[in-house]
Amino acid sequence: EVTALVVDNGSGMCKAGFAGDDAPRAVFPSIVGRPRHQGVMVGMGQKDSYVGDEAQSKRGILTLKYPIEHGIVTNWDDMEKIWHHTFYNELRVAPEEHPVLLTEAPLNPKANREKMTQIMFETFNSPAMYVAIQAVLSLYASGRTTGIVLDSGDGVTHTVPIYEGYALPHAILRLDLAGRDLTDYLMKILTERGYSFTTTAEREIVRDIKEKLCYVALDFDQEMGTAASSSSLEKSYELPDGQVITIGNERFRCPESMFQPAFLGMESAGIHETTFNSIMKCDVDIRKDLYANTVMSGGTTMFPGIADRMQKEITSMAPSGMKIKIIAPPERKYSVWIGGSILASLSTFQQMWISKQEYDESGPSIVHRKCF
């Protein structure tokens, strides 16, 4: 019995592992780095490219590129390097021996799914593969088949209504505001405090500050008042060089931009309005089920206080008396991967794989018929 591989390629992090496991074995940055300078030491074995953590640790001498932008693959050569690294260095498996389940962003262009399929069968010789929509997997991981998923990662945020296991494409909304934008915004507002962060390497420090210290205020204006009148909300953070910085209202001003994108100079609706708009695009008969099953997934939904704030905002927009439930599972950072692990190990799923034989007969377009 061969174990399937599950690979969730996010804009910021790649999560990979084996079907049936309860967590991914490998989680590493979706980065490919290339040296900025010519190597001078002969025989040092300098590589022309580095992937993931190795690229991250050598970031001072590299130019870092993310092949996945806003959840969609934009650079296939680099993407191939990431998959190669996933199979051979992280999971240490021969890809030609295992079926592989890949994930894709909602509303992924058709040509992209075909390209993924082609690379798996032609470059890696996979025996079988499948492409699943990320938000649907998150819903499976929460034990549901109907609900609306607010999936927010590093590169993109989507609201995806799902009914009986099928995503409803006409009601899916995308918001190009996610973790990376919040990190950039935090860099900007820390600069106003007199701390300067500019390089790609320093951006990673700010990302860490964001992950450790930021939270969502239940009432933004009230929180701003508290922050102005006392130092109770201030926290300190030690930089790698030993310098200690203090951060106050930036802690909640940064993630507030999820609810008020105007902070970032964007005209779009916040995540609460986007979720509401997505529900309103659905058939009136299923809205009740969506309000009662609003599932959060992705790393950018990990801020403390986000579920309570979401509950408050949706309640104020929804019809009065509507039962509203925001589900924020503790493992939601990896719920897409976990859903993939569950799906790929179901006995009923085994007939869903696209086999190498089917691919050879029909070509890349087979993916549209078998994966939906």
UniProtKB/Swiss-Prot annotation:
Please name the SMART domains in this protein's record: ACTIN (SM00268)
Q: Where in the cell is it found?
A: Cytoplasm, Cytoskeleton
**For this protein, what is any one GO molecular function term?**
ATP binding
Say if the entry is tagged with keyword DNA-binding: no
**Keywords associated with the record:** ATP-binding, Cytoplasm, Cytoskeleton, Hydrolase, Nucleotide-binding
Could you say which EC number(s) this protein's record lists?
3.6.4.-
Function according to Swiss-Prot or TrEMBL:
Actins are highly conserved proteins that are involved in various types of cell motility and are ubiquitously expressed in all eukaryotic cells.
Name of a matching Pfam family: Actin
Name recorded for this polypeptide: Actin
Write down the CDD domains for this protein, in alphabetical order: ASKHA_NBD_actin
